[in-house]
């Protein structure tokens, strides 16, 4: 099993906390592979984790240049990799994997709370985390998917992705090309492609009771705007059964706030009345054109009301323009 995290050294304030939690809670003897974008970042990451023997750090461009790298033959995949750095989570983990290897791709802002092992996939399907909303953006790329009849999964969170290497490179290259221009300043394109792969490969969502994603709901945005502290925001989360917490978006910066890690541990220690099945998967839910049109209408309505100006966020329709 190849456990892979793509990151830059600039993310160390929160990533160090999360990666150390992974190294501490992972029960197996698997190595953790960190991929980064420059020799300077590689050196900083090596120094940051020098005390953890199971962590290996690589400069991903060096691996990409290997003549045996099959992805070099696909112009769409090459174009994807040259886009936003986050998009490399779709390509670069395969650089450290052999055909048939289990691959687990983890965001550097996923914090692990309990001892665990990753359950093997064992087939050609895909596992992803679940979130109530979705981050399928920009609208232009989602529109292109519907125009080309490329099925999309709803509720996709990209904190963790697990599959057996390699991905279907020919199909991925075709899908990237079919989606047309991909705005390189929009990290969320990655989520659109994982969503496409989910419907192509099958599989399901990891149990969200165990694998929790921070939800940047409208209510939470308003709480933050009204001055809620990191401690108050974290107190809203239910970690009573959680194995991992994807602290996406602004939540990642709370992890290195004074006392935050201890608070998360305390919340995880709360007694739970239930015991979840750690192997349970929920089937992928299709994202429909009808729901997409409703989301676009809601966005226009909220924009007209001044909601996005109030909370200080960009209207979804403006992302990628």
Task: Describe the role of every protein-language-model region.
Residues 21-29:
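Short, acidic, metal-binding catalytic loop of nucleotide-sugar glycosyltransferases
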Residues 153-247:
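Catalytic core and acceptor-binding pocket of nucleotide-sugar-dependent glycosyltransferases
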Residues 31-37:
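Short internal beta-strands
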Residues 1-20:
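N-proximal low-complexity "stem/linker" segments adjacent to membrane-targeting elements
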Residues 45-99:
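Active-site-proximal specificity loops/subdomain of glycosyltransferases
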Residues 116-180:
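Conserved catalytic core of nucleotide-sugar-dependent glycosyltransferases
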Residues 223-321:
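Long, low-complexity C-terminal extensions of enzymes
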Residues 85, 89-135:
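GT-A fold catalytic core of metal-dependent nucleotide-sugar glycosyltransferases
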């Amino acid at each position: 099993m190849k456990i892979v995290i793509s990151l830059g050294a600039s993310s160390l304030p929160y990533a160090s906390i999360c990666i150390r939690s992974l190294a501490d809670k992972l029960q197996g003897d698997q190595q953790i592979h960190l991929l980064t974008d420059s020799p300077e970042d590689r050196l900083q990451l090596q120094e940051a984790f020098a005390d953890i023997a199971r962590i290996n750090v690589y400069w991903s461009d060096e691996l990409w240049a290997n003549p045996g790298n099959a992805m070099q033959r696909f112009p769409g995949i090459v174009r994807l990799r040259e886009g936003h750095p986050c998009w490399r989570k779709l390509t670069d983990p395969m650089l450290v994997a052999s055909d048939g290897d289990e691959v687990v791709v983890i965001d550097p802002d996923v914090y692990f709370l309990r001892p665990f092992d990753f359950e093997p996939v064992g087939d050609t399907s895909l596992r992803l985390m679940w979130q109530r909303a979705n981050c399928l953006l920009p609208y232009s790329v989602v529109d292109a998917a519907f125009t080309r009849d490329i099925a999309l999964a709803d509720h996709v969170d990209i904190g963790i992705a697990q599959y057996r290497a390699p991905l279907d490179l020919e199909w991925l290259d075709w899908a990237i090309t079919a989606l047309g221009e991909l705005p390189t300043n929009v990290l969320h394109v990655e989520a659109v492609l994982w969503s496409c792969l989910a419907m192509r490969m099958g599989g399901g969502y990891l149990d969200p009771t165990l694998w929790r994603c921070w939800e940047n709901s409208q209510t939470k945005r308003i709480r933050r705007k009204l001055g809620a502290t990191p401690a108050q925001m974290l107190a809203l989360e239910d970690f009573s059964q959680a194995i991992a917490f994807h602290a996406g978006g602004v939540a990642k910066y709370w992890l290195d706030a004074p006392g935050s890690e201890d608070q998360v541990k305390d919340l995880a220690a709360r007694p739970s009345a239930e015991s979840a099945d750690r192997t349970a998967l929920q089937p992928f839910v299709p994202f429909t054109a009808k729901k997409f049109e409703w989301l676009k209408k809601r966005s226009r309505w909220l924009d007209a009301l001044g909601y996005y100006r109030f909370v200080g966020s960009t209207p979804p329709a403006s992302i990628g323009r």
